[in-house]
Amino acid sequence: MKAFTQHIGLVAPLDRANVDTDQIIPKQFLKSIKRTGFGPNLFDEWRYLDVGQPYQDNSKRPLNQDFVLNHARYQGASVLLARENFGCGSSREHAPWALDEYGFRSVIAPSFADIFFNNSFKNGLLPIILDAAEVDELFKQVEATPGYQLTIDLEAQAVTRPDGKVLKFEIDAFRKHCLLNGLDDIGLTLQDSDAIKAFEGKHRASQPWLFRDA
């Protein structure tokens, strides 16, 4: 998993509340258990004018020019600004996978659905909760300022606006540690690989009848 320490990124404003996981990555694209291949279909029903299908050539599909991610000024955005209850709906890790592959490192919103919130941390995507008034002000500034960037410092738990104002956010200490060090569930387990191997050795020696090759 990619570590997250500090990030400076262009902000794209998605001014919609209650964005659910089927809108983030529609159900027809969930057949793969690989973490790659979902970025081109992020927000598929909003980005394109036709109905998307798995494995099709997205470069030939008609774009919805009214959708924010298709605007030239937001190309290359790596911070998504959203409204309340982002990521609601069914549980699917494909949602943070799609956001990550598109290029987003963080999503900022007044609130998130619990399952999406948890899945994001496990996949290197930083969800940041700010007060609704702070999010409202960010929307105004982003829309009024082409090239609007935010600086996100995870160690300091701070989002810094271009005008220098610092917005503080809360994060669980364990999740913070994992993101700072790029540790997903597998990475955390591998940190104890020596202890696991030692236990397996003792277990095999004390109960050899459980193992066919003993």
UniProtKB/Swiss-Prot annotation:
Family matches, as Pfam families: Aconitase_C
Stated family: Belongs to the LeuD family. LeuD type 1 subfamily.
E.C. code: 4.2.1.33
Keyword Amino-acid biosynthesis: yes
Catalysed reactions, as listed in the record: (2R,3S)-3-isopropylmalate = (2S)-2-isopropylmalate
The protein's name: 3-isopropylmalate dehydratase small subunit
Role according to the record: Catalyzes the isomerization between 2-isopropylmalate and 3-isopropylmalate, via the formation of 2-isopropylmaleate.
GO biological process, one term: L-leucine biosynthetic process
Residues annotated as signal peptide: none
Alphabetized GO MF terms: 3-isopropylmalate dehydratase activity
Subunit structure: Heterodimer of LeuC and LeuD.
Keyword hit for Amino-acid biosynthesis: yes
